Each structure stands twice: as structure tokens, then as C-alpha cells.
Amino acid sequence: MERFPDYINVTMPSHFYPDDGKWIQEMLAKLRVSTRAKITGEYSEVYQAAWDEEPVSYRKDNAARRAANIRLREFVVEYQEAAQGYTAKPIAVNQP
């Protein structure tokens, strides 16, 4: 468990690229504690799956980082909007 500067405990995923550590902590700190645990597990799963799927050894790190980081970034953006009350505009239904 690592210490984030504002004294929030951020548990890091079991699989991640060390250079991404600070960014991952920043993203996870934006989430609720209950959500963080699930997302760190899923981050590790996506990272490991992308690592295993890449056949070229020197491309494994990049493929794994890219897949896991894109997923984390997209989730955090959508989660923050939902947590702040933003919703999509309802679909208009034609009334006869």
C-alpha cells in the first residue's frame, strides 16, 4: 500500500508498469474507496490479459500499459461525471 500526498491510502494493482504508478494513484484517488478495490483488480486483469496476448516480447509492456491505462482513464472520466450528477439526455419518444 502506497501513501498518496493528500494522505489517502491507495492500494496499487498487482500488475502495472512502475513508470505509471504516480498516474495510477492520481486516477484511483478520484474514486470512492469502495470502487477503488474493484477497479485495481480489473486494472491488473486487463494488464495481464494484454501482456499475455502480445506475441512480441519487446511490445508486451506497451500493449499492457496501453490497454489498462485507457480502460482506467475512460472509467474514471465516466464515473466522475456520474458521481457529480451528470446524466445523458433522455431519448425523445414521439407521442401520437
Question: What do these predicted regions represent?
Answer:
Residues M1-P96:
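C-terminal alpha-helical interaction appendages
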